[in-house]
């Protein structure tokens, strides 16, 4: 969550200085691409297949976000792991690009805004009754449970 607004150009340090808190999140994707296989250009044009986001608790610190480890569990089984480096080298790197693109449109990131910086692990299917949980640095957890499909 941004504590300060960001406009025009900002480097990685300026982006991080504007961030008040970083949160454990799960991105829910809804891809039109079979098997979640696509070209980068197509996925970008499709809004990155983003459907929803589950925002969990704040991480203890915004320092060294590129080193924060995450383990993803799908129905209790580990399905992937990564560090913040999986987001273009650093989670704030995409925000540097976003700030520049918004400035071209006369817009900016406002204080209070939350920006999702991209998935760190591969996507997993989320079927009825599934539970997906991410554990950040062995402590901070966020989970989503998809309820059963109603019957008629």
What are these language model-derived features?
Residues 1-90, 141-147:
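Catalytic-core "active-site belt" of small-molecule-metabolizing enzymes
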Residues 91-126:
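A conserved acidic, glycine/proline-rich C-terminal tail/linker
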Residues 36-43, 119, 130-133:
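Short, surface-exposed, charged/polar-biased interaction segments
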Residues 124-130, 134-152:
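Charged, cofactor-coupling segments
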Residues 74-75, 117, 137:
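Short strand-turn-strand beta-turns centered on an Asx-Gly dipeptide
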